[in-house]
Amino acid sequence: MSSSRPRLHVRLHYEGATRPSLILEAGSLNVLDLSERGLRYRQEFGPEPALGAKLEGILRLTSGETLPVRGTVVRVMRPAKPEDASVIEVAAHLTDVGIPSRVILSERKALQEPPAH
């Protein structure tokens, strides 16, 4: 399903092992994608967050930099694969403070660089 509205912010998609982490009270979770005003993460344990639930934690970027994040859960999805039945993906809109554009640009550059050998 596509939206007729263009995205306001660049969204970075993380694949493979190099991903930012979202550190919440319940533990550290893998970030799947990130923009200045939102993020999506993978949760493999714990209770499913309710839509509208508040989210507060620390985002640890691939560079090692950490940023406080606060937001609201806007979507909860289950992967289509039956073997991943306990896994959920959670999307959150960042409310108070977003991710600075300099961080998004730095992360995008890091994603485009080939890994060091």
Task: Give a label for each model feature.
Residues 32, 80-117:
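C-terminal output/interaction extensions
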Residues 33, 61, 73-75, 96:
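A residue-level detector for short acidic-glycine micro-motifs
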Residues 1-44, 48, 106-117:
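N-terminal helix initiation/capping motif
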Residues 16-22, 52-67:
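Short conserved beta-strand and strand-loop elements enriched in small hydrophobics
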Residues 10, 47-51, 63-65, 84-88:
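A generic structural micro-feature
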